[in-house]
Curated annotation (Swiss-Prot):
GO terms for cellular component: cell envelope Sec protein transport complex; cytosol; plasma membrane. This is Protein translocase subunit SecA. GO terms for molecular function: ATP binding; metal ion binding; protein-exporting ATPase activity. It is found in: Cell inner membrane; Cytoplasm. One of its GO terms (biological process) is protein import. Part of the Sec protein translocase complex. Interacts with the SecYEG preprotein conducting channel. Has a central role in coupling the hydrolysis of ATP to the transfer of proteins into and across the cell membrane, serving both as a receptor for the preprotein-SecB complex and as an ATP-driven molecular motor driving the stepwise translocation of polypeptide chains across the membrane. Transmembrane segments: none annotated. HAMAP family: SecA (MF_01382).
Length: 906
């Protein structure tokens, strides 16, 4: 209450910011008349003047009024579009590294030109990030004439582009592209074997369009580059028969074999379920009689079983995926778009392939990965724009340090948003929706019906067909026709059924969009200028008549067939109507059978309905019900925020390690000589080895000279008479013998360099270092994934899982660095090179290409009981039945005793 009083007296933070920005808008407007007197060459020449001032040290902030005024005047001349005052405010918000919330139809694409132009003057590159290739190409194509007029170059970064084209795109002043492609390019740049192969420059400034979709909705799914791993494809096919033999529990503590937790999106086997699963696996000849699924040797079997259960119980056709051309194609749960080429991890995709009876592809091993949260935090300055950010303002501030500023609309919003109607059953709900659509169609009012899945969109399309109502369907299966359908969605009486994708980025113009038709007439060379003018005038007259008819009918009517988990996505659907002061209306139709109400709010709403004694076909329409539903959505949003925050806390551990690895890798790439690094590694490895077998501050009885000589000879081809030295010099310090061994290793290395030449040896060593850095990092990612999947179980031992994860991840990282040193030293010491040609051949072998797959994948903090892809571990020894004594050499080949190496992790 006190906060509300203070807000009324002093205004909100948003109000105060807008007041500051409006003062700058006045300064920009004051420059307009002077710029209008300049000819085109003088106006375009302002860019060179600004760049010269920036080079002399002038800050971009002080240039802002002039640069924005120049950009606005250039836009008016080149494109016939003059930035509104609210668009200038939006541009300033973006330049300040904040998020601008601007309603649909307020011209976000045009707004981005202002900060893009200003920041491009510094010459460090500006990235404009969109959600798909179509929008990136479209926006770059529309805005390129403006940027080119001002003397700036524009690039488009698309998937499947050749390497040279990508380098050209990044070399441009302003680069448009998708979030996925920018992220993948960053990962690929950190896998190259030559600095010349890189495409990206240092990450300076990014403007993220639909920032809520990219930084919130997709934050739980990391970008993954993977390569094929060894995998038993037949196992998925055989395991697919097991879920049908198990019984699903109707309640968490009810009878049955497994419980499906829809809130957490997980499957859990009961004790009885484990027993029945073991019996079924024995009958299928997958498990030996008397063996347990819990044993270390059967970890992989357990993994396959859980993947099969998840595929059958949690992932449904035409909701989570579609079958297209004999392949499983994932459907994006937030946009409804098909995500061709993406695959679920942890064997889930293969399990779904087995369930649907299509060809099963091999599982992949992660080569590199990063979350959008950590990728976009690499930019020195980050900004975003969207129509719906205010509901997630807290998360933007907490995770990214981005403040959200709500920009007022250019014209008042007059759309009428009605209260939700809640029915008992889905059938009653769909009957009411059909009645509403029929009424709108008869009155000539266009309707956009939003659904949450392909399945629901096709169900509704079937009902409309039965009712004889003409309609268009816009879902992932009709992706190719998306732009055409959206263009016509504002015509009188047109009914459009759409999934969440709803053509974001494309405005629905009341009366229909005639721009493509006008463009076709203008490009038709067979017509005379008069014919063109007449046809365009006739088109515009027809459009005006349709536009007036739609306005009279009430504008675009939005119907939501159910509430989404997030209020923001509901607001996105509503935001399709009421653009630029147009009239419009919206209403959501719900039933107690909808997933959100069934899982989170059904008891409360059902109790209200029973109290009111609602007859069949009647609906509740009350602010209490709408508030109850919004509270349910807040619960889900809060839970999803916690998941994303938890994911970030875990991924920050990997991110710190990723930075170290990538930094060292870049130093190797860019340094002229790596021989000093090789020498330091060799001395470190041999010193550690010596101390392991001949411990410092120990007596002679604790030394194992024979063991050390064997390891040096076998692993490093260093022959030294250590035992003879000790006998001949009983009073010598241990360091004396260590130094002799290091000198012997150095002499052998110098002989190799002399044989092949320093330059050839440098190239070979660089290739060896990079290859082993990449290989070790690849296995380390698998180890971290394996560690993360089971870390939540530490909570049962009264330990903090996050602290345990950080501690063990650091231990694994230290072991990985030791392994890199050891393996590189072994390779350089043992490789037989007698000529520069052999060095080049060995380098080519180390630099062998491998096929890669690019995924934007599901990322879980708490996974199934077991995972795959973990490197050498104590568990693998147990599974293989190997017994290792504490003082025996570790079987991993480190040369250390088992208790000082992998025995520490046992």
């Amino acid at each position: 209450m006190i906060a509300n009083i203070l807000k009324k007296v002093f205004g909100s933070r948003n109000d105060r910011l807008l007041k500051q920005y409006r003062a700058v808008v006045n300064r920009i407007n004051a420059l307009e008349s002077g710029l209008q007197t300049l000819d085109d060459a003088a106006l375009a020449g302002k860019t060179a003047e600004f760049r010269a001032r920036v080079e002399k040290g002038e800050r971009l902030d002080s240039l802002l009024p002039e640069a924005f005024a120049v950009c606005r005047e250039a836009s008016r001349r080149v494109m016939g579009m003059r930035h509104f005052d609210v668009q200038l405010i939006g541009g300033m918000v973006l330049h300040d590294g904040k998020i601008a919330e601007m309603r649909t139809g307020e011209g976000k694409t045009l707004v981005a030109t202002l900060p893009a132009y200003l920041n491009a003057l510094a010459g460090k590159g500006v990235h404009v990030v969109t959600v798909n290739d179509y929008l990136a190409s479209r926006d770059a194509g529309i805005m390129a004439p403006l940027y080119n007029f001002l003397g700036l170059s524009v690039g488009v970064n698309l998937s499947q582009m050749p390497h040279d084209a990508k380098q050209d795109a990044y070399a441009a002043d302003i680069t448009y592209g998708t979030n996925n492609e920018f992220g993948f390019d960053y990962l690929r740049d950190n896998m190259v074997y030559s600095p010349a192969e890189r495409v990206q420059k240092p990450l300076s400034f990014a403007i993220v369009d639909e920032v809520d979709s990219i930084l919130i909705d997709e934050a739980r799914t990391p970008l993954i580059i993977s390569g094929p791993a060894d995998d038993n494809v037949d196992m998925y096919r055989r395991m697919n028969a097991i879920p049908a033999l198990l019984v699903r529990q109707q309640a968490e503590d009810g009878e049955g074999d497994y419980w499906v937790d829809e809130k957490a999106h997980t499957v859990m086997l009961s004790e009885a379920g484990f027993e029945h699963a073991e019996a079924a696996l024995v009958a299928a000849d997958l498990l030996k009689e008397g063996e347990s699924l819990y044993s270390a040797a059967n970890i992989t079997l357990m993994h396959h079983l859980m993947a099969a259960l998840r595929a059958h119980a949690l992932f449904h056709r035409d909701q989570h995926y579609v079958v297209q051309d004999g392949e499983i194609v994932i459907v994006d749960e937030f946009t409804g778009r098909l995500m061709a080429g993406r695959r679920w991890s942890e064997g889930l995709h293969q399990a779904v392939e087995a369930k649907e009876g299509v060809n099963i592809n091999r599982e992949n091993q992660t080569l590199a990965s990063i979350t959008f949260q950590n990728y976009f935090r690499l930019y020195k300055k980050l900004a975003g724009m969207t129509g719906t950010a205010d509901t997630e303002a807290y998360e933007f501030q907490q995770i990214y340090g981005l403040e959200t500023v709500v920009i007022p609309t250019n014209r008042p919003m007059v759309r009428k948003d009605s209260l939700d109607l809640v029915y008992r059953t889905g059938q009653e709900k769909y009957n009411a929706i059909l009645a509403d659509i029929t009424d709108c169609h008869q009155r000539g009012q266009p309707v956009l019906v939003g659904t949450t899945s392909i399945e629901n969109s096709e169900l509704l399309a079937g009902l409309l067909k039965q009712a004889g109502l003409p309609h268009n369907v816009l879902n992932a299966k009709e992706h190719a026709r998306e732009a055409d359908i959206i263009v016509q969605a504002g015509r009188p009486g047109v009914v459009t059924v759409a999934t969440n994708m709803a053509g974001r980025g494309t405005d629905i113009v009341l009366g229909g969009n005639i721009a493509p038709e006008i463009k076709a007439i203008e490009s038709d060379e067979s017509l005379t200028a008069d014919d063109r003018a007449q046809r365009i005038a006739a088109l515009k007259a027809e459009w005006q008549a349709r536009h007036d008819a739609v306005l009279a009918a009430g504008g675009l009517h939005i119907i939501g067939t159910e509430r989404h988990e997030s209020r923001r996505i509901d607001n996105q659907l509503r935001g399709r109507s009421g653009r630029q002061g147009d009239p419009g209306s919206s209403r959501f139709y719900l039933s107690l059978e909808d997933p959100l109400l069934r899982i989170f709010a059904s008891e409360r709403v059902s109790a209200i309905m029973q109290r009111l004694n609602m007859p069949e076909g009647e609906a509740i329409e009350h602010s209490w019900v709408t508030r109850a539903i919004e509270n349910a959505q807040r619960k889900v949003e809060g839970r999803n925020f916690d998941i994303r925050k938890q994911l970030l806390e875990y991924d920050d551990v990997a991110n710190d390690q990723r930075r170290v690895i990538y930094q060292q890798r870049n130093e190797i790439l860019e340094s002229e000589e790596v021989s000093d690094m090789i020498a330091a590694m060799r001395d470190d490895v041999l010193s550690q080895l010596f101390d392991t077998w001949m411990p410092p501050q120990s007596i002679e009885e604790q030394w194992d000279a024979a063991g050390l000589m064997r390891v040096l000879e076998a692993d490093y081809q260093i022959s030294v008479p250590l035992a003879d030295w000790i006998k001949a010099e009983p009073n010598a310090e241990l360091d004396t013998f260590k130094i002799r061994i290091l000198e012997q290793a150095r002499a052998l290395y110098d002989e190799k360099v002399a044989a092949v030449g320093a330059a050839s040896m440098q190239q070979f060593e660089r290739a060896v270092l990079l290859q082993h850095f990449d290989g070790a990092w690849r296995e380390h990612l698998a180890a971290l994934d394996h560690l993360r999947q089971g870390i939540h179980l530490r909570g049962y031992a009264q330990k903090n899982p996050k602290q345990e994860y950080k501690r063990e991840a650091f231990e694994l990282f230290s072991l990985m660095l030791d392994r890199i040193k050891r393996e590189v030293t072994q390779i350089v010491a043992t490789v037989q090179i007698r000529s520069p040609e052999e060095a080049a051949a060995a380098e080519a072998f180390e630099h062998e290409e491998r096929p890669m797959t690019y995924r934007h994948d599901e990322f879980t903090v708490e996974g199934d009981e077991a995972g795959e892809g973990n490197p050498f571990t104590a568990e693998k020894l147990a599974a293989a039945g190997v017994r290792v004594g504490r003082n025996d050499p570790c079987p991993c080949g480190s040369g250390k005793r088992y208790k000082q190496c992998h025995g520490r992790l046992a």
